[in-house]
């Protein structure tokens, strides 16, 4: 079994032009693993700490040279360890850090090493990464939750909801799902142009026009679905990322120009689900509004997927609380929220044991790294959120999923409508 021979890190740029950490791990058999760490725009209060330099003279204080230096310290600890023993590798880094939120070394340093070790070990095993991570039963291709219209923190517009997504639930394969979603994306551009609206792009490749309301965004997408030749609700469903913590303050939500309670937000979402084929709502309420989440889950949880992103931050302790209190029914998985691969697997395992679906997710600040595509298939998650079919940092993940589907051949199963509560029975 190959041992870790050397670890090297560098500062590179992400899709927003901000620095991030890239790590390379070399094994004694010559295998090389490389991984780059993503970064979010709307971040949960309880996420693991991303280490930035704070030197305003470099990249406005967003440099990551300190995190790069931290990797050099990690290297001294890990050289000579078995690359295939991922849990021991990650535990050694957590012990070296010694803080509950990875604040000493930085989650971006630890995660970069964690991912690169796995990539190197997969190469040493002569396996594609998804097979190495998930084993012989990894075969489910995820529904691409394609963010084609942006608002909130991902765009400069007056739309409160951060992401409006399409989900090609009726497609027979991932390849066809990607085609369907891409055709709707192009149709949406035409619809926007015909109405004299902006076709500028947000952080994740979706369009970011200035619209009068959130419903107007949904209606535009519905028009685009029809224009592309698909049936709304049968072929293509809708999904939202509200990112409500961004407009929650002092117990209320500033939404569409009004102050609303959690109960009023729940009534609003119920009306949307009644009128649109929405299969998933992410972060509909604030990360600390546990009572509101319980109320919303009781009211809507059997009809729609209620996804905890800022609520759970891929953290087993917060997820366990959600399970116990019946707050939410699905987990958004972001590897950099928790900061190591094994802790990510622990969160996914806990969710799946309790019938919570998992949606593997990118961040708004991405790179050409395709790790999460393999992770989605390795865990049979059934859903992936990695932006619009535009910009190479987003498309890279979709292209990797095409390769994986081709590798699986007849064993590949596309999750489709079975991934969502709205269509179960």
Swiss-Prot record:
BP-aspect Gene Ontology terms: glycolytic process
Active-site residues per Swiss-Prot or TrEMBL entry: 204 (proton donor), 334 (proton acceptor)
Catalysed reaction, written as an equation: (2R)-2-phosphoglycerate = phosphoenolpyruvate + H2O
Claim: DNA repair is one of the keywords in the record: no
Disulfide feature: none
Pathway the protein contributes to: Carbohydrate degradation; glycolysis; pyruvate from D-glyceraldehyde 3-phosphate: step 4/5
Family to which the UniProt record says this protein belongs: Belongs to the enolase family.
PANTHER family: ENOLASE
Protein's name in the database: Enolase
Originating organism: Micrococcus luteus (strain ATCC 4698 / DSM 20030 / JCM 1464 / CCM 169 / CCUG 5858 / IAM 1056 / NBRC 3333 / NCIMB 9278 / NCTC 2665 / VKM Ac-2230)
Gene: eno
């Amino acid at each position: 079994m190959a041992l870790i021979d050397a670890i090297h890190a560098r500062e590179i740029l992400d899709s927003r032009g901000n620095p991030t950490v890239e790590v390379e791990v070399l094994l004694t058999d010559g295998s090389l693993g490389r991984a780059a760490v993503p970064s979010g725009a709307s971040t949960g209060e309880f996420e693991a700490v991303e280490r930035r330099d704070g030197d305003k003279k470099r990249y406005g204080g967003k440099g990551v040279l300190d995190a790069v230096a931290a990797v050099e310290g990690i290297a001294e600890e890990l050289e000579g360890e078995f690359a295939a023993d991922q849990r021991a590798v990650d535990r050694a880094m957590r012990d070296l850090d010694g803080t509950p939120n990875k604040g000493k070394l930085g989650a971006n340093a630890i995660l970069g090493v964690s991912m690169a070790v796995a990539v190197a070990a997969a190469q040493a095993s002569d396996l594609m990464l998804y097979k190495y991570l998930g084993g012989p039963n990894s075969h489910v291709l995820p529904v691409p939750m394609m963010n084609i219209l942006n608002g909130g923190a991902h765009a400069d517009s007056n739309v409160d909801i951060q992401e409006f997504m399409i989900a090609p639930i009726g497609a027979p394969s991932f390849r066809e799902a990607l085609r369907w979603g891409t055709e709707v994306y192009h149709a949406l551009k035409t619809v926007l142009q015909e109405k004299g609206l902006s076709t500028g792009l947000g952080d994740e490749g979706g369009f970011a026009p200035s619209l009068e309301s959130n419903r107007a965004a949904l209606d535009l997408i519905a028009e685009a679905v029809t224009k592309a030749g698909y049936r709304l609700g049968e072929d293509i469903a809708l999904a939202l990322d509200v990112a409500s913590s961004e407009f929650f303050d002092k117990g209320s939500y500033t939404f569409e120009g009004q102050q609303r309670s959690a109960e009023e937000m729940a009534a609003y979402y119920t009306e949307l689900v009644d009128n649109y084929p929405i299969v998933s709502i992410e972060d509909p309420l604030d990360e600390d509004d546990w009572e509101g989440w319980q109320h919303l889950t009781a009211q809507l949880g059997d009809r729609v997927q209620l996804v905890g992103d800022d609520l759970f931050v891929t953290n087993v302790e917060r997820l366990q609380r959600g399970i116990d209190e019946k707050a939410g029914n699905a987990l958004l998985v972001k590897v950099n929220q928790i900061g190591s691969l094994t802790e990510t697997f622990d969160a996914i395992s806990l969710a799946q044991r309790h019938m919570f679906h998992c949606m593997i997710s990118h961040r708004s600040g991405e790179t050409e790294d395709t790790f999460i595509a393999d992770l989605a298939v390795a865990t049979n998650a059934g859903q992936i959120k990695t932006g619009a079919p535009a910009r190479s940092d987003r498309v890279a993940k979709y292209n990797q999923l095409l390769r994986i589907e081709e590798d699986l051949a007849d064993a590949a199963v596309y999750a489709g409508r079975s991934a969502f509560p709205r269509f179960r029975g």
